[in-house]
Swiss-Prot record:
Chief location category: membrane
Keywords recorded for this protein, A-Z: Cell inner membrane, Cell membrane, Membrane, Transmembrane, Transmembrane helix, Transport
GO BP annotation list: succinate transport
UniProt lineage: Bacteria, Pseudomonadati, Pseudomonadota, Gammaproteobacteria, Enterobacterales
UniProt subunit comment: The transporter is composed of YjjB and YjjP.
Species whose genome carries this gene: Escherichia coli (strain K12)
UniProt-listed InterPro entries: ThrE-like_N (IPR010619), ThrE_Dicarb/AminoAcid_Exp (IPR050539)
An annotated Gene Ontology molecular function: transmembrane transporter activity
Regions of this protein lying in the Periplasmic compartment: 136-140, 190-194, 250-256
Misc note: YjjPB constitutes a split-type ThrE family transporter.
Coiled-coil features, chain-numbered ranges: none
Protein name stated in the entry: Probable succinate transporter subunit YjjP
């Protein structure tokens, strides 16, 4: 019976870590919460090894070890899932949930998804505000809003069809630069600063992965940090390729 319980707790601990890693948590948090959950559910110790595409976790109880491995598939950044997992771990630490209760709560976790139109609208507004704050004027803000909102919607459609992220970023950057650049060619916007073109692709800056990459490397998770840095760099490169393609094909004036 004790072995069966340890096996169940091991599955829950690695599921906890997998939830966090799949939805954008830093490696230190993945390690900490999976260990805390195991100890809260009666394990003597929990050891884990985290990489960008897998987790290996071992629980130790009365000298008996059980090890489990799970592959990691990126499911996109979603802090709602991360906070839900944190809440469940805290409940287990306060003995408000046993391992069966934790298993039930884990099965009920669903990523929070906002409507596409709302996400595209808010992204457009944020990019337009950046343009206005950087002396782009109201006319530049209007161009940025239209270009970035359309580009974000295109990005969502491509992601829904499971297009490779690098190709997705490249095509989205191409669309955003094309829309903003062609609008700047109109006589109405002849005096509009070209910062509008740069601001329209801000939605593609991989800020969260870069922050997590630096945090991982500072906290000793070098391999995971370098992997995240490489992925973010490839996304940035794909964005640059898309921008240069649009500038070259349409003969648009540059950002300066």
């Amino acid at each position: 019976m004790q072995t069966e319980q340890q096996r169940a707790v091991t599955r829950l601990c690695i599921q906890c870590g997998l939830f966090l890693l799949q939805h954008g948590a830093e490696s230190a948090l993945v390690d900490e919460l999976s260990s805390r959950l195991g100890r809260a559910l009666g394990m003597d110790s929990v050891e884990s090894s985290i990489s960008s595409n897998a987790i290996v976790l071992t629980t130790i109880k009365d000298g008996q070890c059980l090890t489990s491995t799970r592959k990691n598939h990126d499911r996109g950044i979603n802090m709602h899932v991360v906070t839900e997992v944190q809440h469940i771990v805290i409940l287990a630490e306060h003995h408000l949930l046993d391992y069966k209760g934790v298993e039930k709560r884990f099965s009920q976790i669903q990523p929070l998804r906002y409507p596409r139109w709302l996400v595209a609208l808010m992204v457009g507004l944020s990019c337009a505000c950046f343009c206005k704050l950087n002396n782009g004027g109201w006319d530049g803000a209007v161009i940025t809003f239209f270009a970035s909102t359309t580009a974000m919607y295109i990005r969502q459609l491509l992601a829904q069809r499971h297009l490779h992220p690098q190709i997705n970023f490249c095509l989205t950057a191409f669309a955003a630069t094309t829309i903003s650049g062609l609008l700047l060619q109109l006589p109405t916007f002849s005096n509009t600063p070209t910062i509008a073109m740069a601001a329209s692709v801000l939605l593609l800056v991989p800020g969260f992965p870069l922050i997590n990459a630096v945090a991982d490397m500072f906290k000793g998770h070098i391999n995971t940090g370098l992997a995240r840095w490489a992925i973010a760099s490839l996304l940035t490169l794909a964005t640059c390729v898309g921008v240069v393609m649009a500038l070259t094909i349409w003969g648009l004036r540059g950002w300066v």
